């Protein structure tokens, strides 16, 4: 059974988050949670928080055990951009785009080999 958790409007660029997301795909849920604790990027902290939420959803809503779960996929999509203006020469203004991301973590049960 698939279980998912979504973190919307995360204040990080999706481009910076996708390499962290790719690194945990296919791992056991608990192993991925522990690996992300030592990953030296801001995106790892946000994905770890979302992964913890997905594990809690599986345990509380679907009565699944954390040791039976693996990371089926982590999707990082673009969210809306905040626009800020910076004054430039001759009275003009430059646009600074503050990017956001939507992080979706999908967990699934491991297949039993019996």
Curated annotation (Swiss-Prot):
GO terms for molecular function: rRNA binding; structural constituent of ribosome. Coiled coil: none annotated. GO terms for cellular component: cytosolic large ribosomal subunit. One of its GO terms (biological process) is translation. Pfam families: Ribosomal_L22. Keywords: Ribonucleoprotein, Ribosomal protein, RNA-binding, rRNA-binding. NCBIfam families: rplV_bact. HAMAP family: Ribosomal_uL22_B. Belongs to the universal ribosomal protein uL22 family. Part of the 50S ribosomal subunit. This is Large ribosomal subunit protein uL22. The gene is rplV.
């Amino acid at each position: 059974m698939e279980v998912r958790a979504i973190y919307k409007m995360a204040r990080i660029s999706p481009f910076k988050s996708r390499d962290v997301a790719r690194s945990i795909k296919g791992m056991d849920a608990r192993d991925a949670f522990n690996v992300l604790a030592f990953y030296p990027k801001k995106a790892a902290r946000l994905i770890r928080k979302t992964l913890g939420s997905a594990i809690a959803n599986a345990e509380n809503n679907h009565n699944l055990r954390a040791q039976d779960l693996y990371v089926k996929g982590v999707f990082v999509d673009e969210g809306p951009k905040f626009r800020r203006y910076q004054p430039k020469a001759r009275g003009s203004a430059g646009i600074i785009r503050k990017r956001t991301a939507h992080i979706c973590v999908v967990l699934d049960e491991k297949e039993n080999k019996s």
